[in-house]
């Protein structure tokens, strides 16, 4: 079932129920708050492992030199930088993010590192992408889908803009599979992480939301089914680090 406001009047913002029309604003406030410390946030949430996850996410993507790639929820540009190495000088990347602060951080970082050619920045909502049909060889989203109000709409849009034969990939925090690890993970998420957020970023509330948003995100099998419903074929996922994150893939034929 779609999470759109047309079908339900409320949705979740972490563990809170809020008006669906308000979620984008609330999420925007979180990411505006953490944008300058976004890598710190990911380091705290993953104990630094997110860098290895992202490298593997890009290394195993179906992408080649000369391809055109859309990286949604592109944040501070780390996925785009890794992708640029895959598509080469003839390839192009569009870094899309709904949050202007995140987009600005990503642009500044990539310019500072000399990554400027054939790289565009677009502020856009994943639920209604401003691109033509069938115009990207690969569409990626890393640690962004759980913050989208209408995930079904975002997946349909990813499918729409993907070329026939192309691949969509989602890297997202998921459902831990090891029973023994769940209480440890919960303690880190709900007791340690907000305190670290208060200590290092002076923002415990945003970090608490981010931990809660992981628990409200669809588990692996459910997200796989959602991708199938959006039109993707050969949908599958690979758990990393005991299911703390999962990489979901789907193809358009």
Swiss-Prot record:
SUPFAM superfamilies attached to this UniProt entry: S-adenosyl-L-methionine-dependent methyltransferases
Catalytically driven reaction(s): a 2-demethylmenaquinol + S-adenosyl-L-methionine = a menaquinol + S-adenosyl-L-homocysteine + H(+); a 2-methoxy-6-(all-trans-polyprenyl)benzene-1,4-diol + S-adenosyl-L-methionine = a 5-methoxy-2-methyl-3-(all-trans-polyprenyl)benzene-1,4-diol + S-adenosyl-L-homocysteine + H(+)
Family designation: Belongs to the class I-like SAM-binding methyltransferase superfamily. MenG/UbiE family.
Positions bound to S-adenosyl-L-methionine: 76, 97, 125-126, 142
Stated role: Methyltransferase required for the conversion of demethylmenaquinol (DMKH2) to menaquinol (MKH2) and the conversion of 2-polyprenyl-6-methoxy-1,4-benzoquinol (DDMQH2) to 2-polyprenyl-3-methyl-6-methoxy-1,4-benzoquinol (DMQH2).
NCBIfam families: MenG_MenH_UbiE, PRK00216.1-3, PRK00216.1-5
Name the UniProt record assigns to this protein: Ubiquinone/menaquinone biosynthesis C-methyltransferase UbiE
Gene3D superfamilies: Vaccinia Virus protein VP39
Pathway: Quinol/quinone metabolism; menaquinone biosynthesis; menaquinol from 1,4-dihydroxy-2-naphthoate: step 2/2; Cofactor biosynthesis; ubiquinone biosynthesis
PROSITE patterns: SAM_MT_UBIE, UBIE_1, UBIE_2
Record GO biological process: aerobic respiration; menaquinone biosynthetic process; methylation
Domain of life (superkingdom): Bacteria
Organism: Xylella fastidiosa (strain Temecula1 / ATCC 700964)
Class of the enzyme per the UniProt entry, highest EC level: transferase
Keywords assigned by UniProt, alphabetized: Menaquinone biosynthesis, Methyltransferase, S-adenosyl-L-methionine, Transferase, Ubiquinone biosynthesis
